[in-house]
Amino acid sequence: MTRNRRLPSYPPRQLDINPGLLERVVAGIEDIRSGKMVIFVDDKDRENEGDLCLAADHISADAINFMATHGRGRISVTLTEAQVERLELPMMQLPDRQGPTLGTAFTVSIEAREGVTTGISASDRAHTIRVAASTRAKPEDLVVPGHVLPLKARRGGVLVRAGQTEGSVDLARLAGLNPAGVICEIMNEDGTMARLADLEQFAERHALKIMTVADLIRYRLQTEILVRRIESASVVLGRTGKPWTVHLYEDSIDSLQSLALVFGDSLQKEATLCRMHVGSTLGDVFTALSGDGRRNLHEAIDAIEVEGRGVIVYLPSQGDLLSELQAAKGGVRDPGMTGKSTTGPLREYGLGAQVLRDLGIRSLRLLTNNPMRLAGIEGYGLEILEFVPLVSARMTS
């Protein structure tokens, strides 16, 4: 790798935030601050569901009763990673079992040790939530199991994982309250999940505001950036001997490093050909896993060189070498689906999206054999105009 002082520069670009979006988010935060609930909606290509959301600081028996009566879903308290660690709550997942598809991080169920009767009443559950969310709470203040299910929010919030768990904690923090929330899925009277049209009627009926994960992402991106570029160099990739520019990024959450491999220039002018690739030492270097990681990576390099310009964002592995060995032993196809996250790279793409934003990219053509729309992608100021299959997929079809 050779240092090059004339490397292309891609200054970070601010997202254009329209007044309507700003007004919606600020109004929602103000409602959370004042003790009101909001309806928090995720992306239509994720669950396309809405949760009643309230700051844990404002929980009450009346609020629990409203959620149980009108929301009808599961009532959970959302806690930061630090609070879950403080309370010494183990995750509700067996080491040899795959976790929930969307990476929902349940801990074991809890109950307040004192101040409750059976634990299931609205007042009992409100009390348990107050105890669990308190900054003064200790492990001995709770018993296990109980009638309240805590959810652990990822550090970095919706900028790292675009879910209602993280969003509820973010909203409480942005409102100047203790970063803990209470959420409850909204169901229709017939037991089906309420979708956007149902949620709009629900909001009008109960005079509640609707917020979306994508809106909150856009709002946070105006003031918070989780990645920074720390080094750049010129390298030769592929088999053509052509120079690429490699930028090294580091995130501010846990100092994980990622790479942006850039070929060509004028990335901002038209839709840029991009590949988001989750790294795997065994798969990419030694081809030891049953997935197509190494082949896909090489095909992406070739495709971008033929195109004349493009970017590969190489993200750190979701797990560690032990996880990769277990994946090889168990025949797990995608190494990105193992280890610390069972949701795969397309579920928690926030850091990679921020890298693309830093390069000035707004619209992209995504190189992938899994043509699904990323949840909340518009919240990062990015738009996928086309899914481009890799060569091996085109040959197979």
Q: What role is predicted for each listed range?
A:
Residues 1-397:
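Catalytic domains of riboflavin
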